[in-house]
Amino acid sequence: YEALKRKASGRVAIKISTGEPGGHNFLQPSLIKDLVQKVSGTIVECNTAYVGKRFTTEEHIQAAKDHGFFDIAKVDIMDSEGEFNIPVKDKKHIQYNIVGTHLKNYDFMINLAHFKGHAMGGFGGVIKNQSIGVASSKGKTYIHTAGKTAETAELWNNLPEQDAFLESMAASAQSVADYFGDNILYI
């Protein structure tokens, strides 16, 4: 953070993956605590598009508690009260990005990504964290289906060829970058 020579200001969203319950594929709270507290950040996430232990807000909050994130900061499941659309530039597959309503509550975002394998995307990192991670449940479905549907129940029957998914993910990540403008950092 210090090496970037830019200060996060205002209401700061710290975008991470809170990780699947029982798993270890997330940044450990002890690793990010000092940065999160230095910028008075709120850890932000959105619910998943698949049924599991982060599909509902209540279960997602419990997963974040179990992984220790509530011990270091406030945690906001941004689509807990709805969603809204933000524009995308590249409309080859998706016409907009569907994000959690609480995104409006933040002036600045720090994208704290970790590297892991992903069944559809190849590798997860900054782009996945900013696209799939900021999208609401319906938004995740919309991206994964390359704009065919936003209905989570229809996700698995509408998967596109991989390039269409990857291009949709890139378009949605760009929309979040555009939304924050200069008020975003990538670590």
Task: Report the location of each language-model feature.
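Extended, low-polarity segments enriched in aliphatic/aromatic residues
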Residues: 1-38, 42-187
